Design a protein with these regions (language model features):
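Small-residue helix/turn framework positions
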Residues: 4-191
Length: 191
């Protein structure tokens, strides 16, 4: 619908087998310059399958994904670009595993962990038999500034331990710069 400063995007909704995207926003026209703002949510019951459908290999298996976003870029909605992308994305992956991770030594921690014992009582043995790194959740947020996505709070809560990540992804230059720390879950294994 029309607004005093451009067009209001009342509702955008995209749905496929593995994902649901919905949002709303504005398309502004100020002094002959277009800009777009889009707020909404994206969810997927199987995020790995969603990415595979886009021909993007991720190594994520059996994990639900939920996110909220508030994004803006200079230009029209159909002229999306990383160079002027700004905003915030809060996201969460739950209960899955990463298949592309070497798990040498991590299985012993997952066998002894109290959190893992609860999963065994629920007859969930994926963290023992599946090759990769099992996690309870991965949560974080990205602040985007002209196509550079910064995070200070990404946390991977895994059966073998906890991983924290801080740093950035430069979407324009396709570069990564992260500090990653791993803390094994030794205390949850002690009597």
């Amino acid at each position: 619908s029309r607004s005093a400063t451009g067009m209001k995007i009342d509702q955008v909704r995209l749905n496929n087998t593995h994902g649901l995207f919905y949002g709303s926003g504005n398309w502004f026209l100020t002094n002959g310059q277009s800009s777009t703002r889009l707020k909404g949510e994206f969810s997927s019951a199987d995020f790995g399958a969603f990415l595979k459908g886009l021909k993007l290999g991720s190594g994520i298996k059996d994990s639900e994904f939920n996110s909220k976003f508030d994004l803006s870029w200079k230009r029209a909605p159909h002229e999306f670009n990383f160079e002027t992308l700004n905003g915030q994305i809060d996201w969460r992956l739950s209960d899955g595993y990463l298949t592309e991770v070497s798990d040498q030594g991590s299985r012993i921690f997952s066998l002894l962990s109290l959190d893992s014992l609860v999963r065994k009582l629920q007859l969930d043995f994926r963290d023992v038999f599946v090759k990769g790194f099992f996690y309870e959740k991965i949560i974080g947020s990205f602040q985007l500034d002209n196509g550079v996505a910064y995070t200070q709070d990404t946390l991977v809560d895994g059966g073998a331990g906890e991983i924290t990540m801080q740093g950035y992804t430069d979407l324009n230059a396709q570069q990564l710069n992260y500090q990653i720390a791993f803390t094994p879950n030794v205390t949850s294994s002690l009597p």
